[in-house]
From Swiss-Prot:
Coiled coil: none annotated. Residues 11-74 form the S5 DRBM domain. With S4 and S12 plays an important role in translational accuracy. GO terms for cellular component: small ribosomal subunit. HAMAP family: Ribosomal_uS5_B. One of its GO terms (biological process) is translation. The keyword rRNA-binding applies. The keyword tRNA-binding does not apply. This is Small ribosomal subunit protein uS5. It comes from Lactiplantibacillus plantarum (strain ATCC BAA-793 / NCIMB 8826 / WCFS1). Belongs to the universal ribosomal protein uS5 family. GO terms for molecular function: rRNA binding; structural constituent of ribosome. Part of the 30S ribosomal subunit. Contacts proteins S4 and S8.
């Protein structure tokens, strides 16, 4: 996995979830906030991060910084993904399927945010199992990491990309 320098990219961010967390201590309850943020450049780079703090803006800032350190490159064929993928993280499973151009992003919630910020315009997805935003995002990223272009598959098999289908 190669490091992607976030300072060279024009990144947009999207807050997917903010959770209120309470810790019960002797004097009462201690309140904190956890944020889940997705960042992407709409050109094949996307990342996610989580942050916790006493105030919401600080949690979002921390999550955004963490997301910029966690960028991945999404291989694309035109406006969609190269092949089907299944991402699994914990109890969450995400099935990603390529779609024809013009069909749009058929995904809900956190998966839609990841796909739009990655620049994938046409994809179909199905969320199976856990629907917790953090598990869904992590499973989506596992699915995106498993994607390979035809050239990468050809190199792994030791044949040229033209002879891959034979």
């Amino acid at each position: 996995m190669t490091f992607i320098d976030p300072s060279k990219l024009d990144l947009d961010d999207n807050v997917v979830a903010i959770n209120r967390i309470t810790k019960v201590v002797k004097g009462g309850r201690r309140l904190r906030f956890a944020a889940l943020v997705i960042v992407g450049d709409h050109k094949g780079h996307v990342g996610f991060g989580t942050g916790k703090a006493q105030e919401v803006p600080e949690a979002i800032r921390k999550a955004s910084e963490a997301a910029k350190k966690n960028l991945i490159t999404v291989p694309m064929v035109g406006t969609t993904i190269p092949h089907e993928a299944l991402g699994v993280y914990g109890g969450g499973r995400i099935m990603l399927k390529p779609a024809v151009e013009g069909s749009g992003v058929a995904a809900g919630g956190a998966v839609r945010a990841v796909m739009e910020l990655a620049g994938v315009d046409d994809v179909t997805s199905k969320r199976l199992g856990s629907n917790t935003p953090v598990n869904v995002v992590r499973a989506t990223f596992e699915g995106l990491k498993s994607l390979k272009t035809a050239e990468q598959v050809a190199a792994l098999r030791g044949v040229s990309a033209e002879h891959l289908a034979e």
